[in-house]
Amino acid sequence: MTLPKIKQVRAWFTGGATAEKGAGGGDYHDQGANHWIDDHIATPMSKYRDYEQLRQSFGINVLGTLVVEVEAENGQTGFAVSTAGEMGCFIVEKHLNRFIEGKCVSDIKLIHDQMLNATLYYSGSGGLVMNTISCVDLALWDLFGKVVGLPVYKLLGGAVRDEIQFYATGARPDLAKEMGFIGGKMPTHWGPHDGDAGIRKDAAMVADMREKCGEDFWLMLDCWMSQDVNYATKLAHACAPYNLKWIEECLPPQQYEGYRELKRNAPVGMMVTSGEHHGTLQSFRTLSETGIDIMQPDVGWCGGLTTLVEIAAIAKSRGQLVVPHGSSVYSHHAVITFTNTPFSEFLMTSPDCSTMRPQFDPILLNEPVPVNGRIHKSVLDKPGFGVELNRDCNLKRPYSH
């Protein structure tokens, strides 16, 4: 089989600060009013009262959705979405295009390495640039799968289990239990600036959900980089009587010493997890060395599927789990091939967590959701990532080349 070359790469955006708000899609924080994901949730900005009540007040949704599409010479296309918006479009169309167009559709690792090295001088340790590279990488995997007629998970070597089981992230673990999920992860609402009173309030929330959900249902806390080591340690011990399964991303990404100390002082049996906002392979190696229990890369932010596979290998070599942060089909096709991912995350994007809404709604068509907390591998058998781009969304292409 002669594989075609890539003819063109194109980039669109929707939502964010320079378009309509509340668009959802790849930037799942960009939701409308009265959504749980924009409620009083602890963040690094919560210490400033002006930005404490709503996360959108400090700009969590300013980037918007990036859509990258790659077209082969035979007319077939692949695409992906992430969080990078209009600025990501500029990076794709004015810089990264030179490493993509003219390459064979199978040259994914070569393109990936060239993108990483060519952006070192302005990418730092991740962020917007890495989100953009991740989106390109995922689009390339989607195109390759469609050209050869295989789902991405088979390109990675095939499934190691028949189905993926999920926990749900949202404000209502009790509803998640009714839907068949194995656990529920809640956001914390208070931080170090609230003192011991904040610890008592979040511990009371866990206690309330433990009573509602029963003894065996997993409960976890997502702290979203909002704490310090002392506060996180005290919160972990305050929640230990309620069998909290893990405490997540308590500290900013680069505080490796803090994660090591937190793991050392956490209650016996309670896991410490992080990784959502780490953006390079090297940062995950260092994070792994802290001894945390689970690494949680976002495939749309960490460097794409190509990097996620490498992160999973680092974790496996140390006996750690890798449980990616959300990311829907882009995670599904990876984790069903990882032996050290026994479960995965489903992010509830319905406003009150009462219904099953696809994570990247409305930008993806045919995006699967768990049924009774599970997705069978047969659901993932369409070529590429198995989803289509909803071109009825208000997509803008601000740059060309």
Swiss-Prot record:
Catalytic site positions: 325
Membrane recorded as keyword: no
Protein's name in the database: L-rhamnonate dehydratase
Enzyme Commission designation: 4.2.1.90
Gene responsible for this protein: rhmD
Gene source species: Escherichia coli O157:H7
NCBIfam families reported for this sequence: PRK15440.1
GO molecular function: L-rhamnonate dehydratase activity; magnesium ion binding
Miscellaneous comment as given in the Swiss-Prot or TrEMBL entry: Reaction proceeds via a syn dehydration.
SMART domains reported in the protein's UniProt record: MR_MLE (SM00922)
Function comment: Catalyzes the dehydration of L-rhamnonate to 2-keto-3-deoxy-L-rhamnonate (KDR).
Aminoacyl-tRNA synthetase as UniProt keyword: no
Quaternary structure and partners: Homooctamer; tetramer of dimers.
Record GO biological process: amino acid catabolic process; carbohydrate catabolic process
Site positions for Increases basicity of active site His: 298
Residues involved in substrate binding: 29, 55, 345
Feature type site, description Transition state stabilizer: 345
Alphabetized PROSITE patterns for the sequence: MR_MLE_1 (PS00908)
Family: Belongs to the mandelate racemase/muconate lactonizing enzyme family. RhamD subfamily.
